[in-house]
Swiss-Prot record:
InterPro entries: hSac2, Inositol_phosphatase, SAC_dom. Ubiquitous. Highly expressed in brain. Residues 856-874 have a biased composition (Basic and acidic residues). Its EC number is 3.1.3.25. GO terms for molecular function: inositol monophosphate 4-phosphatase activity; phosphatidylinositol phosphate 4-phosphatase activity; phosphatidylinositol phosphate 5-phosphatase activity; phosphatidylinositol-4-phosphate phosphatase activity; protein homodimerization activity. This is Phosphatidylinositide phosphatase SAC2. Keywords: Coated pit, Endosome, Hydrolase, Membrane, Phosphoprotein. Its main location: membrane. It comes from Homo sapiens. Disulfide bonds: none annotated. Homodimer. Interacts with OCRL and RAB5A. Interacts with INPP5B and INPP4A. Interacts with STAT3; the interaction is independent of STAT3 'Tyr-705' phosphorylation status.
Amino acid sequence: MELFQAKDHYILQQGERALWCSRRDGGLQLRPATDLLLAWNPICLGLVEGVIGKIQLHSDLPWWLILIRQKALVGKLPGDHEVCKVTKIAVLSLSEMEPQDLELELCKKHHFGINKPEKIIPSPDDSKFLLKTFTHIKSNVSAPNKKKVKESKEKEKLERRLLEELLKMFMDSESFYYSLTYDLTNSVQRQSTGERDGRPLWQKVDDRFFWNKYMIQDLTEIGTPDVDFWIIPMIQGFVQIEELVVNYTESSDDEKSSPETPPQESTCVDDIHPRFLVALISRRSRHRAGMRYKRRGVDKNGNVANYVETEQLIHVHNHTLSFVQTRGSVPVFWSQVGYRYNPRPRLDRSEKETVAYFCAHFEEQLNIYKKQVIINLVDQAGREKIIGDAYLKQVLLFNNSHLTYVSFDFHEHCRGMKFENVQTLTDAIYDIILDMKWCWVDEAGVICKQEGIFRVNCMDCLDRTNVVQAAIARVVMEQQLKKLGVMPPEQPLPVKCNRIYQIMWANNGDSISRQYAGTAALKGDFTRTGERKLAGVMKDGVNSANRYYLNRFKDAYRQAVIDLMQGIPVTEDLYSIFTKEKEHEALHKENQRSHQELISQLLQSYMKLLLPDDEKFHGGWALIDCDPSLIDATHRDVDVLLLLSNSAYYVAYYDDEVDKVNQYQRLSLENLEKIEIGPEPTLFGKPKFSCMRLHYRYKEASGYFHTLRAVMRNPEEDGKDTLQCIAEMLQITKQAMGSDLPIIEKKLERKSSKPHEDIIGIRSQNQGSLAQGKNFLMSKFSSLNQKVKQTKSNVNIGNLRKLGNFTKPEMKVNFLKPNLKVNLWKSDSSLETMENTGVMDKVQAESDGDMSSDNDSYHSDEFLTNSKSDEDRQLANSLESVGPIDYVLPSCGIIASAPRLGSRSQSLSSTDSSVHAPSEITVAHGSGLGKGQESPLKKSPSAGDVHILTGFAKPMDIYCHRFVQDAQNKVTHLSETRSVSQQASQERNQMTNQVSNETQSESTEQTPSRPSQLDVSLSATGPQFLSVEPAHSVASQKTPTSASSMLELETGLHVTPSPSESSSSRAVSPFAKIRSSMVQVASITQAGLTHGINFAVSKVQKSPPEPEIINQVQQNELKKMFIQCQTRIIQI
């Protein structure tokens, strides 16, 4: 259609129709095409594709008209319906301001012989000049003063920034789609119910997904049939349409294409191979729309953030099959403060205040989709636990039989980048998938309908959600194709079809992620290729950091634009964003200057923790370990800290999930054989990085090495200079010991190291990062490496040979929290048959009142590096002979005990692992016990009597009263009878009082805080209590629901977690402790339900500050909820 500019109007005309847009008040009206003759000096500006609507960026500013400048054909849906994507828009100010360069395609009728638009419209410089002149005239006419001039400039700047975000929203993300003949807002099933509806397309759309409804409101209110032509319903989301050929003899062409660019289909395909059309349509709800940290949870209307309906269409011959899934934020009132990296989620309203809005959300969902299968992927421990517990509690309160709640801890099951373990979920809910069916339509009508829907969510409903939705949709598609005879019954999808299908879902995840978080989806490489690769891990780190950066000062503008598009008043003071932006820029510059200092402090903190007092610190570097053999073959590309002392080097590993160092190795320099530096080993393509391989011996055996590389900020660098500098430092240090260390430059062989031995694990009792988040570190590491590189040429290596003069720097480090627990992995075959010869007595001191779990500041852990007292040395000497592998690490007061097999830390995957269980190590913390006082817990259990060891911690929130944090706070012996249990409860109360009294007496004497005495209590007869262990880690355990767990269910006894589980840094919900493959609490007999309830309720412990009666009421309330619950609860 043609766009004309007149004195008072912009006129859109096609054929006999014309739409006049007023440049005075922004009004829209329909007029005949012949009225163009009445316009004052109309000029044709070019061609446009359609009208999106109009928007007012500020109440004091004019309206803007948004037009489709350029579109791209996505494909054709069944019925030959074309689907188009908006690629470029044009924005016109509905005012007297002259339009700037619109770059429109020229109309051949009015611009015959003119190819360049600048010949008929002013140049950009002229437009800017006119704009400035017009603004200047306006300000002069209104008799300005300084205040008004400043306000005018701020309004212009604000309008400019919002307009910039509007253009980026439409053109950068390419996330708006439309069809002139097909209803993209409704699924095939919903469309099939109203096939005979004669209303125009825009009146039949689903209001939830009609994204430009408010912007085009002037036209929808006209009410005449003539307006139908101008209204184009749009969706925000994703659409991709592909035709696949089922050919099992065709190669996948993996070597000829990258994951981002699928191989081209052959132009000539045999007719004997069946074809089918696959379409993926994602529709984002316009209700509670917005950006990641600006929109979370539910609102007062029951709408949730990031709600997306995804439909997968399969079309074969005349048959169309549809399967629909949804995603959406957890429907409770929660938020995350987005101005810090990886902010901690928090609940904004109480449980009772949330119930009504939770019910409103699911009542609407059940009304639309009939049944709901909730798949909750949030972590059942750690910082996400508070949201998962709130979700489960609301489900129990909602108590609807049409709801099914499935909990799947994605990070726990897929730890170590084993994302293929998602099949565990699809296998567990396979029957539910088949029972849900799908919509099947042919020319005659509806054959069957989908009965229910999967509602998948994680915290952001992005990365994890997309992987799981793709897995479920694939199961459904394979069943559909087999029903239609396109696929053989026992054959999987052909490799080439599978690859294109994976790319479609990966693109879907990227598009939704860009709309909500501003960057592409993490884990997208797994969705594309089915495996996790090095490039994907590194890209995830960059994208995660980008999300944080974007949120700092861009999300506020984008959120304001989205709200204005939907007619929602902007509540945030947009003018204050300018100040925030300046503050951020200043802070960013300051952070750049202090990168070196931050990394230095981080290295110093771990140096103080890991290095003994008799070793001297020589240097530390931030690197990446490329060797896949740490713990198991799935650990790749782990961020590490390499610390060098005068006699050893330490490799400290970062955990992706908890964002802190949780394990390290100490390797003697005497065992360091050689260093190799060269290009990284690759199968295809040119190596991008240089790597350093440190070869070492273990028990006189070779074949062990670490492959490390530097993280460089500049992609053009390979980090070789940094690695050479590190290698020279290692060489000099070893030469100072009287031995030489060869440095060899060569192309590294593609091989794996032998499994590393003696890996020591560090776990923090408190929540939060130990120093900084992993991805924050990645952005800092390159600064350190760059610093090393720059100083290399200025350092005289010869002067560094006398390394005996290095002293451990005295620096106060406030990164570490004092409560630490450590696990030691021992790769010793004797551990497999060894008895559990002792149980560690744990003493946990009260935390300082000012230490919050959501605080960025950390108290120093100075006692770890202070010199030991004589009493401590005597205690250490007395404990060194505790057991065959029990020993003391005198450098930091760590006491090791015998191993306990089947610990949680070994549950790396669902498959068997050759790695042995860690020994339990407890780090002493100042307990306040006087020198002459004996710990009340200093007793050894015997077979004749039962005693309870309690170590309560302060609850993090209200749900800690109801969902016990027994995995990190409490160790409880079991009683075999109820009478004995009551007696043990009395003993526990007396013991707690004794600890309190001794603490008071010690505070009166003002004894300084120092490490407490820890005694290791041994039991020659092994454990005297039941425990729930992972099935794969205990040899005698035949099935997931074996002796211990079944006995517990039958007797109703309390279950004591294993020491390693109790020392975990993640607070685990009660359902996370169920280690069976699946537990269902519903739709079973009353007796079986009672057993299940007793199991769940047994996990609800009491907190010491709570009165006995309150805890009993809470326990009874939870038990009653489970008894009356009609919702099926499934834990996988």
